[in-house]
Amino acid sequence: MPNLHDIERRINSVTSTKQITRTMEMVAAAKIRRASERVANALPWACSISDMLISTAKYAPIDAEPLLQTHEQVKRALVVVVASDRGLAGGFNSNVLRHAEKLIKEKERQGVEVEVAACGKKAIGYFSYRGIKPVFEFATYEQAAELSLYAGDGYRNGKLDEVFVVYNHAKNAAEQTLVEQQILPINQQTYADLLGLNPKEEDVLEKYREDEKPLQGDIDFEPDAESVMFYLMKAYLRNAFFYALLDSAAGEQGARRNAMKSATDNANEMVSTLT
């Protein structure tokens, strides 16, 4: 049976750990606000790009943009997985990595050769341990732009037939939802429908759409609809990967705050039990 000195030492140890987890919780809470602002600022652009692309496609020949065409046979796919560099975030990384692995195995069972692009040390380490060498590793907007070129060129040249991105969407400060988005061929499901926006995000998007009311009547394209659509397609691909980075970063901080709050609560409960 532990004596009084042992109990006191245990209380001090738990209290010290609680101070660390409480500090990490507060840091994560501060980072959530900044990350959420970046996501909110990027959301109208993300939605507008996909809306404009779908609208412009109506004015261009059906075969004007190869990225809008569905390949008859799916032989090769690219799965882009967005995780984090650090742990201590509950099931944030494990959920997205397990889902990505499930998607990869499902495609392989269908006879599809799968390439993996990974964002975050956790994703890179997870797949490397399983003998899967990512064909692309990225963590910045510049690298996301390079990945978009790789995906776009691969699809145009017939080297890729499908492109997916898997990441955690920050539904709110306390909740993250898993997103599996088909990037190519372009999915006409809107970002709002895909992500299941919360009321605050819906208000931001609605205000933006009120300010940017669509033009009435015929639309003239310079130099032509095909050129505009080609530019929009490049912007769409860049944005798809970059938005996933922003959204995942906000979700990571929310998951870390939840994990640290749970650890702090457990520490308080243990101290109460020991005293």
What is each PLM-predicted segment?
Residues 1-275:
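C-terminal beta-strand-loop-alpha-helix "lid" module of Rossmann-like NAD(P)-dependent dehydrogenases
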